[in-house]
Amino acid sequence: VATGASIIDMDFFEALGFKHYQGSQFENDAELRKNYIDRIYDTYIDEDELQICDKKICEIADNLEPKSYTSREFIYEIGRYLKENSVKKDSLIETAFDNNVPIFCPAFTDSSAGFGLVIHQEKNPKNHITIDSIKEFRELTEIKIRSKGSGLFMIGGGVPKNFIQDTVICAELLGKEVEMHKYAIQITVAD
């Protein structure tokens, strides 16, 4: 699975028991900010709850060996955390963890989890984890090279879509002959 930042901003957030609220894209952002409400287009999130989510991400990172991780490796650790601590069961992350399905999030810092990792690195300036997107792209390309056939399941567009589609080209640049992906499913909200 290749996804955008929504995997953290929505799935992890809701697995912790928090909710998103339907709002309006026309609301005054300054007024929302005064009330500590974040707006993602027409969806509202309580900033206090979002910061709890960020602190949980920091806590997960604090308990890992300080080294470079791919987003897949870190999301797997989030899944492990949710297995023990989720309020709302059967989130996408927890289900992927249970079934050993890799989730790649190439724009990881575009999510609120990026704030959690900044807090983690600030607390641990010399010994912290990092998310290595190049290592991640190489890992996904190696999966493509080893596969007998592949299909794509994409949540969102932009970076994750390009990221997973480009594994064919990257494999070719590494001197490997691979087939194109056999199918693609994309879930997105297009205006």
Regions found by a protein language model. Give the residues of each.
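Conserved catalytic alpha/beta core of Sir2/sirtuin-type deacylases, generalized to analogous enzyme cores
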Residues: 1-191
